């Protein structure tokens, strides 16, 4: 005879950011415009790069893909968060949870690889400008993009594979605002050792490899900039790197806080806040960071507006 404890879970209840009805209403009013700005801003970056011949370079090719990934990253998480603000109880089936987990990890991991690729692109442009056209040829750019997306899919398969092999027969309330693996592992019954270790290893390898690439690239970039005799050349080199460094610092700072810091050093609410930053806020900020601090993007924007008669 089947007991209550043997009943398998078929859906999860997402607890969200808060259980206060007033605060949920305030957060909905705040985060809905954030999501709209994220989608509109990143689509605008993609269209601007596609329609501006002067931006048809590897650097802006990678930026357009970063904008696409940011749309996917935010969309994998934000809609269900907005729904949780409007409902007392937000439920999601196991299949939906697996899909959200997979898409979130895939886009997040791809963003890591793209940020590393963009750092390598800046390294080649500043440290080996005469070899730039050969070392960043269309074939190599396509390879780097393909590898970034493949890496995202492989890491996502590690997470979703562990999730689908978990058994859930007890509590089904996820203490998060989306289906993240580690809160889900806490709800599983039976042995979950592999589900804890395997994703941690794959995520650590992604973070270490991409962050190492970024750090090494910028060490060489800084060395090359300091050797430049022209102040104008140094300023131009710094300006091309500042926006990327800002995006890297914001993204990796919050991701490392969530996935690297010892779990005992922070609370579940602190994890939620950090997760909001890197999944919801940063995808909105990236178009602003790369457009407001980039002369070429601003010039392309002015030319596009002039062509469409938006301003003289």
From Swiss-Prot:
It is a multi-pass membrane protein. This is Olfactory receptor 5P4. Residues 1-25, 76-99, 155-196, 259-271 are extracellular. Keywords: Cell membrane, Disulfide bond, G-protein coupled receptor, Glycoprotein, Membrane, Olfaction, Receptor, Sensory transduction, Transducer, Transmembrane, Transmembrane helix. PANTHER family: OLFACTORY RECEPTOR. GO terms for biological process: G protein-coupled receptor signaling pathway; sensory perception of smell. Its main location: membrane. It comes from Mus musculus (Mouse). GO terms for molecular function: G protein-coupled receptor activity; olfactory receptor activity. The chain crosses the membrane at residues 26-46, 55-75, 100-120, 134-154, 197-217, 238-258, 272-292. Residues 47-54, 121-133, 218-237, 293-312 are cytoplasmic. CDD domains: 7tmA_OR5P-like. GO terms for cellular component: membrane; plasma membrane. The keyword Transport does not apply. The gene is Or5p4. Disulfide bonds join 97-189. Potential odorant receptor. Belongs to the G-protein coupled receptor 1 family. It is found in: Cell membrane. Pfam families: 7tm_4 (PF13853). Glycans are attached at residue 5. The keyword Transport does not apply.
